[in-house]
């Protein structure tokens, strides 16, 4: 009798482990992924090459951009996961005009997949605009 009970308990334990592992499976669909909103980008991306550089052949430079995000660790972590080039400047409004409850974030295009990075950033609800940054 105890061996049957052990088998049953083992089966139930495995069932719940598998069920828990499948929480991200298609059986439990998540909400739709946010769509990128490229209208949030206020500068021309056309001159930027695949390496994220723009300018004459003998003077290529990365393009810096700035955005405002909520002044929370969660928002900073989310943005940093999307864009490893980003640096945060608490207390600075930047040219873009971040409010006191926001943090200025500055990144640049000189990274692999820079277009995808910008698209991901525009899909964040709290990102209202991405402007070119001139580092003044």
What residue spans do the PLM features occupy?
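Short acidic amphipathic segments
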Residues: 121-131
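N-terminal Sec signal peptide cleavage junction
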Residues: 22-25
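Bacterial N-terminal signal peptides that target proteins for export
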Residues: 2-12
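Surface-exposed aromatic
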Residues: 93-108
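Short linear loop/turn motifs
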Residues: 94-96, 132-136
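N-terminal secretory signal peptides
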Residues: 27-85
């Amino acid at each position: 009798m105890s061996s049957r009970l052990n088998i049953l308990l083992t089966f139930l334990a495995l069932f719940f482990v598998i069920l828990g592992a499948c929480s991200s499976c298609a059986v439990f669909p998540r909400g739709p992924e946010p769509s990128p909103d490229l209208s949030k980008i206020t500068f021309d991306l056309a001159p930027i090459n695949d390496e994220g550089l723009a300018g004459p052949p003998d003077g290529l430079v990365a393009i810096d951009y700035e955005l405002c995000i909520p002044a929370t660790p969660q928002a900073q972590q989310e943005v940093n996961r999307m864009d490893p080039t980003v640096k945060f400047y608490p207390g600075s409004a930047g040219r873009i005009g971040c409010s006191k409850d926001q943090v200025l974030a500055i990144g640049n295009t000189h990274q692999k997949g820079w277009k995808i990075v910008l698209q991901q950033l525009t899909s964040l609800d709290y990102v209202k605009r991405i402007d070119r940054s001139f580092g003044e």
